[in-house]
Amino acid sequence: AHLCTVWRDGQYKRTRDPAETQESFEELLRRLGTDYIDIGMIHYVDSPKEWKSLSEGKLMEYALKLKQSGRIRRIGLSSHNPLAALAAAESGLIDVLMFSVNPCYDLLPANEDCETLWSDDSYAGPLLNMDPDREKLYEACQRLGVGITVMKALGGGDLLSEQSPAGKALTVSQCLHYALTRPAVASVMTGVHTISQLEESLAYEHA
């Protein structure tokens, strides 16, 4: 379950307000009819500066209190920025990282604007090797026991297109295999758009 999110004006939005975060979490428990959540995922932290502020403030105090009381079992964080994610992993405060992993995103350097991940301009120049910050992040998570849950394994479907940043269409199995073989990766949320993509995802188990 996400922490630091609210449903407002018909939209799912990020918040950094402790009172809103607590109210939203309590409402989620009521809706689910439960008294605990396995992972409390702090939503969308994409800069080292924001992580530092959050980790030293009341939101982290609240997350730690939830964990200590058993109302969440693990603290997680979602991010698109390897530098922010690495700072979180190395802090010892998080147990789980939700991070965008695929063969194309891994070529790009850290950026606080996640829109660069799916911008054509980002792939216009030569990109030959994995970004060292991303490589360092995966290795650190493996070493520190921080499990990675992958998002955007298919790049929102972009990697399956002939206009893929890879220069040709990749298959669902190729994208899943890439993500699942990165260090520390425990699971992948495929994010399918079609029944066919869902069937291909399920078929990976027997590929």
Regions found by a protein language model. Give the residues of each.
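Active-site groove signature of glycoside hydrolases
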Residues: 27-50
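Beta-strand segments within the central parallel beta-sheet cores of soluble alpha/beta enzyme folds
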Residues: 1, 38-41, 77-78
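Beta/alpha (TIM)-barrel catalytic core signal, keyed to glycine-rich beta->alpha loops juxtaposed to Asp/Glu
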Residues: 45-207
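Generic anion/oxyanion-binding catalytic loop in active/binding sites
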Residues: 10, 26-29, 187
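Active-site mouth loops of central-metabolism enzymes
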Residues: 3-22, 48-52, 160-169
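Residues in well-ordered alpha-helical elements
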Residues: 19, 35, 195-196
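Short, well-ordered amphipathic alpha-helical segments that serve as non-catalytic structural scaffolds
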Residues: 18-29, 62
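Short loop/turn segments at strand-loop or loop-helix junctions that form parts
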Residues: 2-4, 42-43, 153
